[in-house]
UniProtKB/Swiss-Prot annotation:
Molecular function via GO: lipoyl(octanoyl) transferase activity
Catalytic activity: octanoyl-[ACP] + L-lysyl-[protein] = N(6)-octanoyl-L-lysyl-[protein] + holo-[ACP] + H(+)
A GO cellular component annotation in the UniProt record: cytoplasm
Family membership noted in the UniProt record: Belongs to the LipB family.
Full protein name: Octanoyltransferase
Record has Cytoplasm as a keyword: yes
Note, other: In the reaction, the free carboxyl group of octanoic acid is attached via an amide linkage to the epsilon-amino group of a specific lysine residue of lipoyl domains of lipoate-dependent enzymes.
Record's keyword terms, sorted: Acyltransferase, Cytoplasm, Transferase
Active site annotation, chain numbering: C176 (acyl-thioester intermediate)
InterPro entries: aa-tRNA-synth_II/BPL/LPL (IPR045864), BPL_LPL_catalytic (IPR004143), Octanoyltransferase (IPR000544), Octanoyltransferase_CS (IPR020605)
Length: 222
């Protein structure tokens, strides 16, 4: 078990350009793998950008009104921008259960627990990556995205949660390749949550998230 006290927590107040964050993640991933830098939880926002995962299809890019960047993570297209909190999670799974599926499951659970702190019930959906809830219209909608990469058993990328982004910006893509469902946010659900409030709530669940990484994910939790 690796304790949270050894993990660097970085909370940005200014927007970080996506390419800059991508380069920083790659460097930190390598340093963690070499044992020359501590693990990192990095919480931030980006200027508007569309990012393409390794499974992204060109026909899912409907209106590239913002820069499009190859992210190198799993998944398809997603949008990042102001009002959306992104969490980059760089952890050494050699110190924990070497279980990629278990890592993703625990990451989803971490976000779901934090959303519950703000009165939003959310869930995983079989066959659909991400975090789901009921939108203001009562229909199922996506409130958070998950995308990870593992290099030398050190994780990269992580999650994003819609606090109060301009939801119209998602119209330039088919988010995560899923056409039949929309997107929502905490603000659209009547919850005004600042980045600082989100970070504090998220980090209050950090120890529980890390504890789940010490045990392989059970088959029924796929």
């Amino acid at each position: 078990m690796a304790a949270s006290e050894t993990i660097e927590i970085r909370r940005e107040t200014a927007q970080v350009p996506y390419r800059e964050a991508l380069d920083a993640m790659a460097s930190r991933n390598a340093a963690i793998a070499e044992g020359t830098a501590p693990e990192l939880i990095w919480l931030l926002e980006h200027p508007p950008v569309y990012t393409a995962g390794t499974s992204a299809s060109p026909d899912e890019l409907l209106d590239p009104r913002f820069e499009v960047v190859e992210a190198g993570r799993g998944g398809r297209y997603t949008y990042h921008g102001p009002g959306q909190r992104v969490g980059y999670v760089l952890l050494d799974l050699r110190k924990r259960a070497r279980d990629v599926r278990g890592f993703v499951h625990a990451l989803e659970g971490w976000v779901i627990e934090t959303l519950a702190d703000f009165g939003v019930e959310s869930w995983r959906a079989e066959g659909r990556v991400g975090i789901w809830t009921r939108g203001a219209d009562g229909r199922e909608a996506k409130i958070g995205a998950i995308g990870v990469r593992i290099r030398r058993w050190v994780t990269m990328h992580g999650f994003s949660v819609n606090l109060s982004p301009d939801l119209a910006h998602f119209g330039g893509i088919v988010p995560c390749g899923i056409e039949e469902f929309g997107v929502t946010s905490l603000a659209a659900l009547g919850r005004e949550v600042t980045p600082d409030q989100w970070d504090e709530a998220l980090l209050s669940h950090l120890d529980g998230f890390l504890a789940r990484l010490d045990t392989p994910c059970p088959p029924e939790a796929a």
